[in-house]
Regions:
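PP2C/PPM-type serine/threonine phosphatase catalytic domain
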Residues: 1-194
Length: 194
């Protein structure tokens, strides 16, 4: 398995669209497998989690439930493979859109960001990684829930959402004057409103 390999998952359901990206940590041998399992866990949770897009659902509880499910999947895989759970460490980010309800939730953990472009053309941050992460947060360590970013939004507010990878100082150079610069930049995915 290549270290640090990216996994992108796009899943259309009857009432929702899931778009996520994850990548294994550079020093983890099974990070790509962990990234795939993590995106599956997030997709399954948000699909089954009826009402997570509503204002009545507490985001801190959603974070805890989500992290618990991710850890469970990684732990089961580690047992199956005879490995340590930390070998499956990864960073992830993405968005789930419920077009019929005009709602979305974006999520991230570790490096990366989710940005939104309004109908007026302004690009603003929805979720950001910390500006200078000294040591990336670990899914399998105590306190990880505080590093999981979740944010709700109204889908019609945005013309386009962007999922970017890497540390903030890397991708911040690519966003200027309300546009994503061409060339070498960390843009992974762009989701346009229809």
């Amino acid at each position: 398995m290549r270290k640090g390999s990216k996994v992108i998952k796009i899943k259309y359901e009857e009432d929702s669209i899931f778009v996520g990206a994850a990548w294994g940590r550079k020093r983890t041998r099974w990070g790509r497998k962990g990234a795939r399992l993590t995106l599956e866990a997030i997709s399954d949770y948000l699909k089954k989690g009826a009402g997570v897009h509503s204002e009545e659902a507490y985001l801190d509880e959603v974070k805890c439930d989500l992290l618990r499910l991710i850890r469970k999947r990684l732990y089961q895989q580690a047992l199956k493979d005879g490995k340590e759970i930390k070998e499956y460490e990864c960073s992830f980010e993405g968005v789930v859109i419920w077009p019929g309800k005009n709602k979305f939730i974006c999520f991230n953990f570790g490096d990366g960001a989710v940005l939104g472009k309004t109908d007026q053309g302004h690009i603003g941050s929805l979720l950001l990684s910390e500006k200078r992460i000294r040591k990336p947060p670990q899914l399998t360590m105590d306190g990880a829930v505080s590093d999981v970013g979740l944010k709700r939004g109204v889908w019609s507010t945005y013309h386009e959402l962007y999922i970017l990878e890497g540390r903030q100082e890397r991708w911040a150079m690519s966003v200027s004057e309300d546009k994503i610069e061409e060339g070498e930049n960390p843009l992974l995915l762009s989701i346009k409103a229809c």
